[in-house]
């Protein structure tokens, strides 16, 4: 995709440079020991070890360690390389501020077969050339370690910094700029470790050279990298690119900001890319994997981020804006966790294969076409997804048939996802959509969703609203839409559609039966209800379930739904995400006690006996009178406690759940809230322990006991 500096052109240029160097060298230049490194016009070796370079500057060579120390040197040399190395394994140590101006020649040249060239030291080096390379290791490698180097050249068709066998930059600051060529180039691998690297390529001859290019792998760990390129790739490799823990900015005006035909891996990095041309800002001909960190990629003429193979993004904050797409993959696309904002002129997020979105926050916006588009299977599991399109006659979410015609795509939606869809049309599901637990809102101008839609095993519709708009939407029976048989192209019933589905849980009635469920006759004592469903029940008491002497007192629900309302035998609530037991509880009227006549309910009981409750014993009437008073006294919708645990919870909830002074340590209470309620009630003097270390939460309490305890709590 990108053009790099032609190897043939580069070799020809180097051969000509080498020929010029040889022309100016005397015959003695090839003496082995005395002439190892040339600095300007002076050879350094065993005999001559120090040469003055500029005002107060020195170049000192140690042949034993093969180290050339530059101390505040100024080298102006334009008829061959300013520093020409012939020794294997040379180290150049920088002390103070050093500068090299080599005119039309190479600044530092390490000749063929000299192996590793190392630049290091606490000082700095500034290399400028008019028409040559700044640093070149011929058939060798280059290490820039713990130092500062600036390299710039006005040359065309060459490289500012290059080494044939690989380049490593470690703990250093490197600035490299070129008029038209590669700022950094190696046929080997490029490794940048905890460094601050800045590169630029102006491509003044419009040949499209990359600013940074490796024919091998590029590995960047830590530090910062900023690369800009006019008309070429800003950062590219012929093999793979790995970026870890790095702050990276890469921009191109006519090509890719980042390109590789191999795999691209980005780990815990802050990456910003921009492409103003007609090629993707970030592109891999293979797979892209991004884990953690932040990514912001912009492209005005193509894709913001794309891979021919798979694309996997995990726990990353992504803000992409592209022309064709913000995210593209030819293979499977997986988006897990994190936050993804994707905007594009055409399709916001597009996979030519499957797409899986798991527990991610996704906001996808397309101006012309689809916000989300995939083939095979689109699975949205958990998280929050917003899909919006402004295109005419376009679906916001579209399942595209596979290129080989193997299927028309299908959708799976669940995990409690919140899915919001807006567009001319809502969702084209392909072959079908399977919904588990989800909250789906579709606001369309034409139709909301193409059928068929089914619910996964163990799940069902909890609530459905439909209408021409959100303002006119009303509840409706989902199964009245006559979903089967499916007719291709048949639209959804409503422009505005809101669905809430959930896992089905068991509603079980003990000591009674369901006679009516949500306005329809029902026979049985169990029902499977999806979580989130509004439930209205009419119940019938099974009097035969009570023991001799017991009378019905109240309906008790466990767990107690937050919006529970009880009106006689009619109960309403929203089904929680767990099973619910409804129990008809009865009580044995209390034995006569001396204070029975002193009960505040004594007159009420007598009235009951003299009125509609004729035939009951005095004490039964007394108990029913207490029950009636409790229903009027307790908070609306609260069940009358049947045991000590329920009584403690009633008192504790009414007091706004205060924390007890001591941690509960009951051996017979496993539920944390019940334990706290019991401990608090005992500390408040409203209840007592039953025995050492036990509270006996299941022990029955009479209505009279409930009434007295409730009044004792100043209610």
Q: What does each model-identified segment do?
A:
Residues 1-7:
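N-terminal secretory signal peptides that target proteins for export/translocation
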Residues 14-24:
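Bacterial N-terminal signal peptides
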Residues 25, 29-31, 588-676, 683-704, ...:
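Feature responds to low-complexity, polar/acidic, surface-exposed segments characteristic
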Residues 30-504:
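A composition-driven surface/loop motif
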Residues 57, 79-81, 103-109, 131-132, ...:
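Short, recurring structural edge motifs at helix starts
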Residues 458-479, 534-568:
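Surface-exposed interfaces of beta-sheet-rich extracellular modules
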Residues 495-509, 567-596, 677, 709:
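Conserved "repeat-terminator" motif of extracellular CCP/Sushi domains
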Residues 516-549, 575-578:
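Extracellular modular ligand-binding repeats in secreted and cell-surface proteins
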């Amino acid at each position: 995709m990108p053009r790099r500096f032609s190897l043939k052109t580069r070799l020809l240029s180097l051969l000509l440079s080498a020929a010029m160097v040889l022309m100016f060298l005397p015959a003695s230049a090839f003496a082995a020991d005395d002439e190892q490194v040339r600095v300007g016009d002076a050879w350094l070796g065993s005999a001559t070890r120090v040469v003055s370079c500029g005002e107060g500057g020195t170049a000192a060579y140690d042949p034993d360690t093969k180290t050339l120390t530059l101390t505040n040197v100024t080298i102006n040399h334009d008829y061959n390389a300013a520093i020409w190395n012939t020794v294997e394994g040379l180290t150049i140590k920088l002390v103070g501020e050093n500068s090299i101006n080599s005119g039309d020649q190479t600044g530092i040249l390490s000749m063929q077969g000299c192996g590793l060239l190392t630049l290091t030291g606490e000082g700095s080096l500034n290399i400028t050339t008019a028409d040559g390379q700044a640093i070149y290791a011929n058939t060798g490698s280059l290490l820039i370690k713990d130092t500062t180097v600036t390299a710039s050249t006005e040359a065309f068709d060459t490289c500012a910094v290059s080494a044939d066998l690989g380049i490593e930059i470690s703990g250093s600051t490197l600035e490299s700029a070129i008029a038209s060529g590669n700022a950094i180039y190696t046929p080997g691998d490029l490794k940048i470790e905890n460094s601050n690297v800045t590169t630029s390529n102006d491509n003044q001859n419009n040949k499209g050279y990359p600013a940074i290019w490796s024919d091998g792998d590029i590995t960047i760990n830590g530090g910062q990298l900023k690369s800009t390129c006019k008309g070429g790739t800003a950062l590219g490799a012929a093999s793979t690119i790995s970026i870890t823990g790095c702050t990276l900015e890469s921009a191109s005006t006519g090509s890719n900001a980042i390109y590789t035909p191999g795999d691209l891996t980005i780990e815990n990095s802050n990456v910003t890319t921009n492409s103003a041309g007609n090629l993707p800002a970030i592109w891999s001909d293979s797979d892209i994997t991004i884990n953690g960190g932040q990514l912001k990629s912009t492209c005005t003429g193509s894709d913001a981020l794309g891979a021919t193979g798979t694309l996997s993004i995990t726990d990353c904050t992504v803000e992409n804006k592209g022309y064709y797409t913000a995210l593209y993959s030819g293979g499977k696309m997986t988006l897990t966790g994190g936050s993804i904002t994707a905007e594009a002129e055409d399709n916001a997020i597009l996979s030519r294969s499957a797409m899986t979105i798991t527990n991610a926050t996704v906001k996808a916006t397309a101006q012309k076409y689809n916000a989300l588009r995939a083939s095979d299977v689109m699975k949205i599991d958990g998280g929050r997804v917003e899909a919006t399109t402004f295109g005419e006659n376009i679906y916001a979410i579209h399942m595209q048939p596979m290129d080989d015609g193997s299927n028309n795509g299908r959708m799976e939606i669940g995990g409690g996802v919140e899915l919001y869809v807006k567009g001319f049309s809502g969702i084209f599901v392909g072959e079908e959509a399977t919904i588990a637990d989800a909250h789906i809102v579709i606001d369309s101008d034409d139709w909301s969703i193409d059928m068929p839609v089914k619910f996964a095993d163990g799940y069902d519709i909890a609530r459905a609203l439909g209408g021409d708009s959100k303002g006119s939407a009303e509840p409706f029976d989902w199964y009245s839409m006559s979903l089967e048989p499916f007719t291709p192209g048949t639209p959804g019933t409503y422009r505005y559609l809101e669905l809430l589905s959930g896992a089905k849980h068991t509603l079980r009635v003990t000591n009674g039966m369901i006679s009516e469920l949500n306005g329809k006759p029902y026979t049985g004592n169990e029902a499977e209800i999806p979580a989130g469903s509004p439930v209205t029940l009419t119940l019938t008491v099974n009097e035969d379930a009570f023991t001799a002497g017991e009378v019905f007192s109240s309906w008790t629900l466990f767990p107690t739904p937050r919006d529970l309302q009880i009106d006689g035998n009619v109960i309403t609530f929203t089904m929680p995400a767990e099973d619910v037991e409804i129990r008809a509880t009865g009580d044995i009227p209390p034995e006569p006690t001396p204070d029975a006549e002193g009960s505040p309910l004594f007159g009420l009981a007598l009235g009951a006996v003299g009125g509609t409750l004729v035939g009951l014993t005095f004490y039964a009437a007394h108990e029913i009178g207490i029950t009636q008073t409790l229903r009027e006294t307790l908070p609306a919708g609260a069940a009358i406690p049947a045991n000590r645990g329920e009584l403690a919870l009633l008192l504790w909830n009414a007091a706004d759940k205060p924390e007890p002074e001591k941690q509960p340590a009951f051996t017979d209470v496993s539920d944390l809230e019940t334990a706290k309620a019991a401990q608090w009630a005992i500390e408040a003097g409203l209840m007592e322990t039953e025995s050492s270390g036990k509270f006996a939460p299941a022990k029955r309490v009479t209505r009279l006991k409930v009434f007295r305890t409730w009044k004792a709590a100043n209610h």
